A protein has these predicted regions:
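Nucleotide-activated sugar donor-binding and catalytic core shared by glycosyltransferases
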Residues: 1-412
């Protein structure tokens, strides 16, 4: 009889709420794959704490956005980087997993690699090296052994850019398809009158400020073109007051709903959507809701477009490799253009049918081949990296990289 596997100690460092959500699912999947003989150290939030992590400090200490807030708290953040890396080095874990928040987690990884050069380091969630500062991919070779990608085209990008081995483990939204997709009754509501149109102007106050007027004007024009429809606006408690204030000037104020369950319920009934660029466009696409994406930034941020190397800012378009979803940016994010793009999606013409077919292709590209969850694939990749380091070679206990169709992004 072979000896049972020895206990593992894994360091996990997440820098914000989204990383905390990925982290707790990874911890759970590692225990399911390995059993209870596994201990965790590092930094996380409430979800990871519920799975047994005693965070070195509150995740709120490092979850800072924006240039000015970061500069104000820079000395404290640098201190947390040092504290985190020193604690990991002292603990001598079997592996380090860093999750998103590269400005923090990658600095921790570099310090740990210098002190423990043989420690396997896994980066869960790729930085957007395919869009911004591509030289980061090659630089990561010095301190990352494996990248776990959420988007199916990212392994190809790392191969092209000369970065670490990158594998597609699946996007966490794949685990939520039952919540996103309609049951038979909801599917019938999608096809009934009046149609449900969902509008999502963003989750930040700056987005609300820049988009609400244009979205409201577009919806007024849409009503003139197609007649009555039911308008639903999902939002979050921290921006509810701003959203309600801005929507009060619309000709017909929307039905405003709060929280994720209500948002997904609206998606399941929606005929079409108008949404700010972001993860929500991928949620809508996986829910099978034809949409128009839009965004506006300030003058300073607009200049950064010359440094960004992607043909689209919408995740579904990048995954598909084609401009299947209309996007209206900056000056194009105007009521007339938004209404003109949205109206055909509420009807049943060729524009809607083409996008519905594209969303089906997106679903096929993102699907994992064996039915296991993204968290299970991520756990297998982490364990494979540890086993491979011990054996002096890579062990392929994860999903093999898959390439998207070879085609340029077409406008249309």
């Amino acid at each position: 009889m072979s000896d049972p596997p020895r206990a593992l100690k894994i360091a996990i460092v997440a820098g914000e709420h989204s990383g905390d959500q990925l982290g707790f699912k990874l911890m759970r999947a590692l225990r399911e794959a390995r059993g209870t003989d596994i201990a965790f150290i590092g930094v996380g939030g409430e979800a990871m704490a519920d799975e047994g992590l005693r965070s070195l400090f509150p995740i709120a200490d490092i979850a800072v956005m924006g240039v000015v807030p970061v500069l104000k708290r820079l000395p404290a953040i640098l201190g947390r980087i040092r504290e985190t890396s020193e604690a990991i080095v002292a603990a001598r874990p079997d592996a380090l997993v860093i999750i998103d928040s590269p400005d923090f987690t990658h600095r921790v990884a570099r310090r740990v690699r210098k002190a423990l050069p043989g420690l396997p380091i896994v980066d869960y969630v790729s930085p957007s090296v395919w869009a911004w500062r591509p030289g980061r991919a090659r630089a990561m070779l010095a301190y990352v052994d494996r990248v776990l990608a959420l988007l199916p085209f990212e392994p190809e990008a790392y191969l092209r850019l000369g970065g670490p081995l990158c594998v597609y483990v699946g996007h966490p939204l794949i685990e939520r398809l039952d919540e996103l997709r309609p049951n038979p009754e909801e599917a019938r509501r999608r096809e009934s009158e009046p149609p449900v149109v969902v509008v999502l102007p963003g989750s930040r106050r700056s987005e609300i400020h820049r988009l609400m007027a244009a979205f409201g004007g577009a919806l007024d024009l849409l009503r003139d073109r197609i007649g009555a429809f039911e308008l639903v606006l999902p939002t979050l408690p921290h921006i509810e007051a701003e959203v309600r204030g801005a929507a009060a000037s619309w000709r017909e104020p929307p039905h405003i709903v709060l929280g994720e369950p209500e948002r997904y319920a609206a998606f399941r009934r929606a005929r079409a959507a108008l949404a700010a660029s972001g993860t929500v466009t991928l949620e809508l696409a996986l829910a099978g809701v034809p949409l128009v994406g839009a965004y506006k930034v300030g003058l300073v941020e607009e200049q950064l477009k010359y440094l960004i190397k992607v043909p689209s800012i919408l995740l579904p378009n990048l995954i598909l490799g084609e401009a299947a979803i209309p996007e209206k940016l900056q000056r194009q994010c105007a009521p007339e253009e938004l209404a003109a793009a949205l109206a055909p999606l509420v009807g049943d013409g060729p524009e809607r049918q083409a996008q519905v077919k594209a969303l089906a292709r997106l679903d096929a590209l993102m699907r994992l081949p064996d039915g296991r969850s993204p968290s299970a694939h991520a756990a297998a990749a982490v364990l494979g990296t540890i086993a491979g380091r011990r054996a002096g070679r890579d062990l392929d206990l994860f999903v093999a990289p898959r390439k998207r169709p070879e085609k340029r992004l077409k406008q249309g």
